[in-house]
């Protein structure tokens, strides 16, 4: 433990006012009067509680307190104000890493060593009750990296640094079990502290387990100093909250930002090289906590960005926020998400030119902009439609994809199908949880791929819905699936009993009911997916263009009614037409086969050439020529045809079929027997050479 505490990464600099607050806290907790000690003496009371809490199995044993006698000058006015306005809070074991430690930790975990990452950054912020139950709001900086983050360190002293969610690290999966244990230990510690609260923390009740999960979830992203912006936003609102203490869950992030308000630029430059000396298991337990907001299923869905806009208006004009943003280069779009990981809006990164006195007006600075189009999801976390303006456009895919198959207990749950809370870059955030996900794609691009690979129950065929135990006996879009299945089975039996083929039925329907009910609509699977999610005008244009191109309009309909390869709505539409036609066909059949033939029409005769039969002698000659040359010339094929007394076209087709059969054989052997594929390679080469 002593070696760990001597690490420069952990024993860093801290402002004197904050140290004095910590010293007063420790003096009250330990029953000792050491509030007026020097900076060098303050290190002992800060470190003592950490060692004493090791027996409680808390995450504090992995982190040391920060203190350094090098900072002896009084703090800046902002630091004085922070120490004066914020009442004392327990300092003991805080499961946080500072910005410097996070940056070096990422460099130590990621392959390659140097911090050359370019991954989205999630910055959590809570706005003192103005978000209406939105815990765990996260600010995402998709284009940030460790290079353009270094300029933000200077703003850390003024605005403070909050915790970051270092998701998408390779160490996440390997440390998952340790992180779960740390979470459990933290909850146990909180319960113990609630049972025995210190006398000086009466105004700061312990937060619910949800708040620590936020603080642990957020220390996980490679660009720590991006946190100054939200951290500087927080001090105005949480200050009054600490005095009133109406929402304990929002105290914890503020105390974390106070903790990380300590690092200075000199500390940033000196500490990163020391971090890799710690193993990932010891250096990143709390930062690498899995994305807990995905597990918080009790909070309501944030489908409106107005709440976030109201919250941001109170802190948009923060001078520290503007100073921090002025140092960002290459960071443009940001995303505001709630505790469920759902995007509720965007924030443009623009420094505020106005002074901090204009904070009350909220007219300048940052504004949350709602994202459109938005994605409509169901309770299983599947995207079922996109919302553009007032239109809901279903997303079609017969397979269906669950958006967040992360780990057990980490799947994203959506409250209802009617709530719209995800924006165009939902796929980007969801992919953050995958340790092997690539962040090179833009959020909109991710969303388009996610939406194109998602499905809704209305787009699935009847056969797929019937095979699903959850929907087999139910109704989809008001259509009884069991009734459709029974009708399709009976229709096929009735058709066969009349001696009719599917082609005949299609021709008859096309003649009597129109081309939309041709064989293509009943028997064959040919569909234009755009028919489902294009606007009505686009559908009409598509149909008109298909008619102009002499294409069957029935191709626009889902098909294969008899095999249930058709959507419920289309099946419900075509069912009465088939029933009416079949009843008339059966009536004509009872009146006489001639009447049925007149009703259906004769099937067009197809002239087919007689299949050629090769004699064994002819096959022997053909195989001998094929072994010599698989691609004979036209003159050679003519000579072979004259020699065998066959048509030249017959010989040409035989060589084509023989070559294709050889390719299929080689391909099949390579797939099923890799060991035997090696001797066949010279054969293939020789064949190609001869050709």
From Swiss-Prot:
Its domain of life? Eukaryota
One Pfam family, short name: Homeodomain
Keywords from the named record: Disease variant, DNA-binding, Homeobox, Nucleus, Transcription, Transcription regulation
Q: Give any single GO term for biological process.
A: regulation of DNA-templated transcription
A GO CC annotation recorded here is:
chromatin
Q: Gene3D superfamilies of this UniProt entry?
A: Homeodomain-like (1.10.10.60), lambda repressor-like DNA-binding domains (1.10.260.40)
- Identify the coding gene: POU6F2
Please describe the organ and tissue distribution of this protein's expression: Expressed only within the CNS, where its expression is restricted to the medical habenulla, to a dispersed population of neurons in the dorsal hypothalamus, and to subsets of ganglion and amacrine cells in the retina.
* Family from the record: Belongs to the POU transcription factor family. Class-6 subfamily.
Domain (POU-specific): residue spans on this chain:
476-586
Entry protein name: POU domain, class 6, transcription factor 2
């Amino acid at each position: 433990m002593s070696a760990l505490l001597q690490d420069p990464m952990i024993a860093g600099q801290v402002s004197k006012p904050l140290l004095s607050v910590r010293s007063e806290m420790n003096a009250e907790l330990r029953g000792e009067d050491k509030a007026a000690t020097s900076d060098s003496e303050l290190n002992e009371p800060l470190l003592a509680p950490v060692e004493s809490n090791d027996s409680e199995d808390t995450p504090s044993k992995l982190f040391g307190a920060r203190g350094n006698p090098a900072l002896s000058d009084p703090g800046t006015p902002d630091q004085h104000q922070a120490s004066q306005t914020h009442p004392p809070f327990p300092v003991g074991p805080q499961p946080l890493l500072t910005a410097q430690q996070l940056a070096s930790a990422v460099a130590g975990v990621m392959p390659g060593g140097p911090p050359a990452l370019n991954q989205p950054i999630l910055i959590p912020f809570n706005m003192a009750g103005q978000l209406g139950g939105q815990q765990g709001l996260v600010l995402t900086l998709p284009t940030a990296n460790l290079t353009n983050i270094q300029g933000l360190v200077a703003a850390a002293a003024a605005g403070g640094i909050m915790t970051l969610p270092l998701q998408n690290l390779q160490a996440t999966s390997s440390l998952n079990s340790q992180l779960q244990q740390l979470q459990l230990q933290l909850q146990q510690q909180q319960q113990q502290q609630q049972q025995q609260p210190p006398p000086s923390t009466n105004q700061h009740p312990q937060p619910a387990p949800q708040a620590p999960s936020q603080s642990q979830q957020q220390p996980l992203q490679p660009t720590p100093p991006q946190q100054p912006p939200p951290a500087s936003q927080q001090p105005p609102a949480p200050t009054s909250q600490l005095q009133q203490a109406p929402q304990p869950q929002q105290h914890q992030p503020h105390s974390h930002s106070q903790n990380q308000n300590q690092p200075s630029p000199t500390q940033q430059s000196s500490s990163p090289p020391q971090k890799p000396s710690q193993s990932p298991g010891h250096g990143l337990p709390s930062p690498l906590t899995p994305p807990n907001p995905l597990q918080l299923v009790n909070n309501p869905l944030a489908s409106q960005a107005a709440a976030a806009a109201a919250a941001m208006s109170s802190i948009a004009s923060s001078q520290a926020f503007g100073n921090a943003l002025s140092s960002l280069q290459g960071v443009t779009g940001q995303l505001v998400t709630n505790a469920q990981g759902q995007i509720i809006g965007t924030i443009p990164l623009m420094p505020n030119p106005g002074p901090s006195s204009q904070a009350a007006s909220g007219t300048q600075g940052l504004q949350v902009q709602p994202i459109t189009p938005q994605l409509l999801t169901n309770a299983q976390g599947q995207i079922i439609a996109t919302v553009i303006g007032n239109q809901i456009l279903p997303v079609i895919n017969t397979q269906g994809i669950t958006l967040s198959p992360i780990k057990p207990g980490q799947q994203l749950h959506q409250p209802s199908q009617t709530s719209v809370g995800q924006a165009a870059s939902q796929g980007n955030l969801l992919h953050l949880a995958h340790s092997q996900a690539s962040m090179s794609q833009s959020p909109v691009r991710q969303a388009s791929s996610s939406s194109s690979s998602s499905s809704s129950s209305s787009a699935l065929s009847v056969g797929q819905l019937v095979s699903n135990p959850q929907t087999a006996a139910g109704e989809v879009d008001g259509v009884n699936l069991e009734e459709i299945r029974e009708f399709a089975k009976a229709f096929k039996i009735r058709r066969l009993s009349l001696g009719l083929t599917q082609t005949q039925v299609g021709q008859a329907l096309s003649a009597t009911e129109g081309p939309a009910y041709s064989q293509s609509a009943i028997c064959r699977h040919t569909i234009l997916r755009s028919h489902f999610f294009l606007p009505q005008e686009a559908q009409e244009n598509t149909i008109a263009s298909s008619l102009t191109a002499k294409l069957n309009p029935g191709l626009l309909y889902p098909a294969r009614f008899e095999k249930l390869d058709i959507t419920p709505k289309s099946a419900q539409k075509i069912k009465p037409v088939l029933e009416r036609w079949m009843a008339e066909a059966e009536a004509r059949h009872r009146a006489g086969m001639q009447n049925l033939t007149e009703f259906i029409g004769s099937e067009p005769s197809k002239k087919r050439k007689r299949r050629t039969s090769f004699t064994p002698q002819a096959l022997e000659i053909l195989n001998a020529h094929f072994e010599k040359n698989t691609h004979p010339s036209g003159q050679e094929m003519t000579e072979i045809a004259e020699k065998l007394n066959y048509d030249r076209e017959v010989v040409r087709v035989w060589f084509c079929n023989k070559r294709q059969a050889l390719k299929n054989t080689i391909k099949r052997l390579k797939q099923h027997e890799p060991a035997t594929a090696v001797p066949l390679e010279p054969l293939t080469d020789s064949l190609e050479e001869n050709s």
